[in-house]
UniProtKB/Swiss-Prot annotation:
GO terms for molecular function: 3-methylbutanoyl-CoA dehydrogenase activity; flavin adenine dinucleotide binding; monooxygenase activity. The gene is sfnC. Involved in the dimethyl sulfide degradation pathway. It comes from Pseudomonas putida. InterPro entries: Acyl-CoA_DH_C (IPR013107), Acyl-CoA_Oxase/DH_mid-dom_sf (IPR046373), AcylCo_DH-like_C (IPR036250), AcylCoA_DH/ox_N (IPR013786), AcylCoA_DH/ox_N_sf (IPR037069), AcylCoA_DH/oxidase_NM_dom_sf (IPR009100). Its EC number is 1.14.14.-. It comes from the Bacteria. Transmembrane segments: none annotated. This is Probable FMNH2-dependent monooxygenase SfnC.
């Protein structure tokens, strides 16, 4: 009798590549349509990737942030909206891990892994229109929130409200998305990231139990808790890089198969034209430099994450510099490639059916999440004055 063969689990990146191939078949059409990518979100649920960063002790895969962001990049090459909500799902999991007690985050992790919950975002700390009203053992959230990425078709939400009784302190909670009083308006209609469901939400006397509030240690209260914004920033850097890599590859295939050399060129094909080659050489230098910066930052993040509450403020500051550097580079080189890809593909590449413009639209939209000038300012403070970035929800 033969012993049973234990098939090892498939690597997450292999699963992601298979899914990305499926997403790519409809990505152009869905970019035009907008709305909620329900079928694609369900495919993510079925894949098991929603538990990627959850430790194995709680039913997850125990992946590193390095490997989790590799999946974000894989999706971003073909569908940056899916990449964004997938990455933000894991950012929400990081939020409860960093801001709450073990008796809170551990059951949430276990249920997420077992039920393949999708987490959405209604935090937006700059939108202070949602306020708290306190009762005995519970409270109410009432008001509006903007930029609620991934909230539609989610099982859980990270939401925030201003506690005017505590001088404007921000209270953050983890609550079921379908709770009475929560309305998701599905009103996202921007030029890019059109299937991220980043529209608005209304909270009408939404009951929040005390054990759903993330109070201990709370937001940004320790160097470890202050990793949350850095995870967000590295997510964006990987998203930017993935979009740029996807744009590069689409342009490359078009140049090789469709483009024609200019009539004054002595080259037999566009692939031999010296000006086209110059552009591709510059694209390559930009992509390689960003890849190296992101690789370094991801390794530093994993090291910081492993230290947990032993992480020092200086180590956290050094990580902020590494991630900030990577994000600025990813933004600049990504926008450059997504704009200049038409220089190497030609006029016919502007045909609406190709939607090559979606790469720039998606990247331009996402890079406006927080101004790159302020990230550069922080890097300048370090370069000139030896000042590390102070923790905030954006740095």
């Amino acid at each position: 009798m033969n012993a049973p063969v234990n098939t090892p689990p498939r690597p997450a990146l292999a699963i992601a590549r298979e899914l990305a191939g499926q997403f790519a078949q409809t990505a152009v059409e869905r970019d035009d349509r907008g709305g909620t990518p329900k079928a694609e979100r369900d495919a993510l649920r079925d894949s098991g990737l929603l538990s990627l960063v959850i430790p194995q002790a709680f039913g997850g895969q125990g992946a590193s942030w390095h490997d989790t962001f590799a999946v974000v990049r894989e999706f971003a090459r073909v569908d940056s909206s899916i990449a964004h909500v997938f990455g933000f799902h894991h950012l929400m999991l990081a939020t409860v891990r960093l801001f709450s007690r073990p008796d809170q985050w551990q059951p949430w992790f276990e249920q997420t892994a077992r039920k393949q919950w999708f987490w959405g975002n209604a935090l937006n700390p700059l939108d202070t229109r949602t306020v708290v009203k306190h009762f005995d053992g519970w409270c109410e959230f009432s008001g509006k929130k903007s930029f609620c990425s991934g909230a539609s078709d989610s099982e859980m939400l990270i939401a925030s409200a201003v506690d005017e009784r505590a001088g404007g302190k921000l209270l953050i909670a983890a609550i079921p998305s379908g709770r009475t009083g929560i309305s998701l308006h599905n009103d996202w209609n921007n030029i890019g990231q059109r299937q991220t469901d980043s529209g608005s939400a209304t909270f009408e006397r939404v009951r929040v139990e005390h054990n759903e509030l993330l109070l201990d240690p709370g937001p940004l209260s320790t160097p470890f808790a202050a990793l949350r914004p850095l995870i967000a920033q590295l997510h964006f850097a990987n998203l930017f890089l993935g979009i740029a890599e996807g744009a590069f590859e689409e342009a490359r295939q078009y140049t090789l198969k469709e483009s024609r050399p200019w009539f004054r060129s002595s080259a037999a094909s566009s692939a031999e034209d010296p000006y086209v080659l110059r552009h591709y050489g510059e694209f390559w230098v930009g992509l390689e430099s960003v890849r190296l910066l992101i690789e370094r930052a991801a390794r530093q993040l994993d090291a910081a994450w492993a230290k947990e509450h032993a992480l020092t403020a200086q180590e956290r500051g050094d990580l902020a510099l590494a991630i900030g550097t990577a994000k600025v580079a990813a933004s600049r080189h990504g926008l450059d490639i997504c704009n200049r890809l038409f220089e190497v593909t030609g006029a016919r590449a502007t045909h609406a059916s190709l939607r090559f413009d979606r790469h720039w639209r998606n990247l331009r939209t996402q890079t406006l999440h927080d101004p790159v000038d302020y990230r550069i300012h922080e890097l300048g403070e370090w370069a000139l004055n030896d000042k590390r970035p102070a923790p905030s929800f954006y740095s």
